[in-house]
């Protein structure tokens, strides 16, 4: 049943868990397949990367806010390399990145070579190109009286507003909201 001998650790008493032999076999298979694809199991100290059909999956057990931070950094770097803005899916245990022309080695390099203190500055430059900024700008713009209440955020000419308000307290407030509500820059360092 446990063909990879993953669940036979002396520190793990599997009988403490309500799982039958069939379930145990399924669990072992799933873990084994993951290890074959990514070379290990992700933990809070070990990040693994899987190459799927059209995406790279970064298995990171860091939680949603840290993964959001890391995901936006990786997407910005991938988009810079490929010349196209990719797609990002964030979950508490993984980051999915769809961008053409990137490899797992690229992701490892960007994670290892980006100075932690540069993270906030990089995100401040790259986030204004993100989809999330549109919604936050609509929210903050209404509070500052820039955008009328009831305006559909999808109809905002975001690039024009970003150009107009770059370097002002308005755009800084938008970024601060994103950093505080969606990301954990300190934790990602």
PLM region descriptions:
Residues 1-189:
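Extended, highly charged accessory segments
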């Amino acid at each position: 049943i446990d063909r990879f001998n993953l669940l036979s650790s002396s520190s793990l008493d599997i009988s403490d868990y309500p799982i039958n032999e069939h379930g145990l076999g399924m669990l072992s298979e799933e873990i084994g397949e993951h290890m074959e694809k990514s070379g290990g199991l992700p933990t809070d100290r070990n990040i693994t990367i899987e190459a799927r059909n059209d995406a790279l999956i970064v298995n990171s057990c860091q939680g949603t806010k840290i993964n959001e931070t890391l995901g936006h950094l990786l997407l910005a770097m991938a988009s810079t390399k490929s010349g196209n803005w990719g797609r990002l899916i964030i979950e508490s245990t993984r980051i999915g990145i769809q961008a053409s022309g990137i490899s797992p080695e690229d992701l490892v390099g960007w994670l290892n070579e980006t100075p932690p203190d540069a993270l906030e500055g990089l995100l401040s430059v790259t986030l204004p190109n993100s989809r999330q900024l549109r919604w936050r700008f609509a929210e903050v713009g209404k509070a500052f009286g820039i955008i009328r209440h009831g305006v559909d955020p999808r109809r905002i000419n975001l690039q024009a507003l970003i150009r107009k308000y770059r370097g002002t307290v308005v755009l800084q407030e938008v970024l601060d909201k994103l950093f505080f509500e969606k990301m954990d820059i300190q934790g990602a360092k």
